[in-house]
Amino acid sequence: MTGIKRGRMKTVWLVALLCAWPMGVDAAEPESPLPAPRFHHLHLNSVNPDKAIAFYAKAFPSTSKTVWNGFPALASPNNVMVLFTKVSAPPRADPQATAYWHFGWNVMDERKNLEFYKEHPEITLAPLYTTDEGGTVHVNSDTWPGTGGILGLTKAQIADAKAKGVQPLGGAGFSYLRGPDNALIEYAGNYPAERFNHVHMHQENPYCAQLWYQKHLNASLPVGIFPRTEANCVVVRGAERSWPGLEKEGMYRTPSAGVIFGDVAMNWYMRQTETPLVGTRGHLIDHVGLSVGNLDAWAAKLRSEGVTVLRRPYRLGDTRAMMIEGPSHEAVELVEMPAGSP
């Protein structure tokens, strides 16, 4: 065999050997991301869970009383629950103290719901202020409509709307109730079916919080939303308040962001006060629960990403869970619910 042929043969064998050699870890195909969690429950602290559940079942008749792993619970037809822990003293319920502001339902006929609530004195309506001078409505669509995708108007915009004779749109919109333990509850219409549909929040940095939920919990975004990056997610809170609002002084509505788990939205505005948000454990809204298929895989992922773990995996009735802390100190429980679980 000539030198040229021997050289060619060596080259062929070398190529074959390299092709057959196992690829290194760095060259391996990336693992598929874990399936996004679904919204499982909202967990409230209450001095009287049974009374609270009766209130919600009356206000939202699609819901029903149940028990889940020993917790008194309210079941919504979209496979979402509100769980309760009985406490000896009223829980702190300041809606601006923590990341969890309020929670709410979609309803089929908002005006019909409003009339029903008015007929029942045990249900307290929470009015919306239309300006900082006073004046209230029960439904946001009974005052000047927002503009530019913002659900309110600033002082200057209200003055302009008055000057132009702008009229309320009427019809469905959003409204609020005061519930047991001083809970703040939103109901909005009109939708094809009644269901628990959102948790509204405050965040220190709304865009950064959205990135956090995407990165660590594989959250989905609302349609048409394009997230910022870590390089530009920190922004200054909008300078002007707008109305209508639950507070007479109005509220800051920019910036805003949010994510979706299953068919439940978690939306937020920036913190409304100058006081940093505190942890949610022990408050009226203690935490939210998200269901995952493989808790061990999620625990490993979150540890590797440096997420703050409030409680390592623990027994929760006939399943397991772990508790982590979100970007503004909100507690989030991950509940192991294998595929096919109810």
Predicted features and spans:
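N-terminal secretory signal peptides that target proteins for export/translocation
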Residues: 1-9
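Bacterial N-terminal signal peptides
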Residues: 12-22
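Vicinal oxygen chelate
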Residues: 27-34, 115-201, 220-260, 265-270, ...
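Mature N-terminal segment immediately following signal peptide/propeptide cleavage
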Residues: 33-68
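Extracytoplasmic/secreted envelope proteins and their assembly/folding machinery
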Residues: 39, 49, 53-57, 100, ...
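Short, surface-exposed ligand-recognition loops at beta-strand->loop->(often short) alpha-helix junctions
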Residues: 43-48, 106-108, 201-206, 290-293
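Conserved active-site tyrosine of GNAT-family acetyltransferases
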Residues: 52-57, 117, 182, 209-214, ...
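Mid-chain, structured segments of secreted extracytoplasmic proteins
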Residues: 76-118
